[in-house]
Each structure stands twice: as C-alpha cells, then as structure tokens.
C-alpha cells in the first residue's frame, strides 16, 4: 500500500521518515518531490569492469546549467538526505522530467528499509538537455511493509552504500567479487577524481578522460 500525503507527513513528524531539507510544498498527493544536487560525475574509462573499482570524474554544475548528451551515463545525486524506517522507498522520475527525455535511474529505483543517505542517480538522456542544480528531478513514494524485518539496510554488514555522502557514489559491484590474485585493489571509497567547476563531463570512448568544458547559456 502506498502512503498518502497525510501518512507521509505523520511519518516525517514521528521520525520514521527523514527528509532534509523538508519542504511542505514538495509533499504531493502520495509522494514527495526531490531535487537535483550540485554534483555530477562520469566514469573515466569508456569500458567499465564489474570486477574492479571504476574511477569517476566529478564536476559541480555552474549557475548557467550543464548539458547532458545522449550516449553518456551520468551519476547525479539528490539534494535531499533521506532516512526510511518501517517503509520501503521508491524513487521515480517526475513526468515533466521524463518529457524532456531524461531518465533518472537505470534499474535502481527501489530503496531498502533502513536506507539512510542521499540518492545517487544513474542519469541518461534521449536528446541533449540542459539541467540545473536544485531543479525538481524525482519523487519518493513510500510503501508499507508486510511482516517483521530482521535486518534493516542500516544494520547489514554487507550493505555497500551506507557511507553518507552528498556526492555521486560509483558502482561498488566489485565488492561482490573476490579480488583477482595479485591485483592491487583501489579503495572503493576513493574512486573519485575532481574536475574544475563548469565542466561538460564527457568521457572518451577509448577510456581517455576529456577535460570537462562548460557550455555557456544561450
């Protein structure tokens, strides 16, 4: 069963749902609107390896916006930090965002009970689109749970995304594999490279990172 606006508000007041910052105007009929944070990232290598950490190149979006282009995966992040206790959160794109040809997640729309963090977005576009930090990007929907829970996400030792960060977090799929013999594994928490503000964030297909380039407002 999906929570109504009244039930979401009650859960926020009781602390079972935490949304920071919380804006009453963002509470919809049966959802809560979340916004795009200021950071975007792309993977450095053109071909990713599921068995190893994949470095990312991060940019901070300038005031004039940032152009997303087709054929490129972008990792974004929500402006809001959330916690969900006793419910299951789902993140879906807003209709107005979808009509711009923007997908905000590949397959990872469902959160777990006990998830306490910002939401990393796996963004792609059908056509070039200029986006802006702070724009509405998605909506959280909350489902009731049937039956008791043994371990919430925040208490699972195997949970890979418990470290709280307002930055996009790259895939940690490699933690599901044993490190290859003789391979000096990179730290899963330090796969980020910083770029100068105002970048374009594209990555060369052959694995060479292009220097981000801003596109000015037109």
Regions from the PLM with identified roles:
Residues 1-202, 206, 218:
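DUTPase catalytic domain/fold
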Residues 215:
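Cysteine-centered metal-binding/redox modules
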């Amino acid at each position: 069963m999906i929570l109504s606006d009244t039930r979401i508000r009650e859960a926020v007041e009781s602390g079972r749902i935490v949304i920071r910052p919380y804006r009453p105007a963002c509470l919809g009929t049966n959802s809560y609107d979340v916004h795009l944070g200021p950071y975007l990232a792309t993977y450095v290598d053109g071909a990713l390896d599921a068995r190893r950490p994949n470095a990312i190149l991060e940019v901070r979006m300038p005031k004039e916006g940032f152009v997303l282009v087709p054929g490129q995966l972008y990792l974004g992040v929500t402006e809001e930090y959330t916690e969900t206790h006793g419910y299951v959160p789902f993140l879906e794109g807003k209709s107005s965002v979808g009509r711009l040809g923007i997908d905000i997640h590949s397959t990872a729309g469902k959160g777990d009970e006990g998830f306490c963090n910002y939401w990393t977005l796996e963004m792609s576009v059908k056509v070039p689109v200029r986006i802006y930090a702070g724009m509405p990007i998605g909506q959280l929907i909350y489902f009731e749970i049937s039956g008791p829970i043994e371990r919430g996400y925040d208490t699972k030792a195997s949970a890979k995304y418990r470290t709280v960060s307002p930055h996009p977090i790259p895939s940690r799929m490699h933690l599901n594999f044993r490190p290859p013999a003789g391979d000096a594994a990179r730290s899963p928490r330090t796969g980020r490279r910083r770029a100068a503000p105002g970048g374009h964030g594209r990555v060369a297909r052959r694995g060479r990172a292009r220097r981000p380039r801003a596109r000015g407002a037109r």
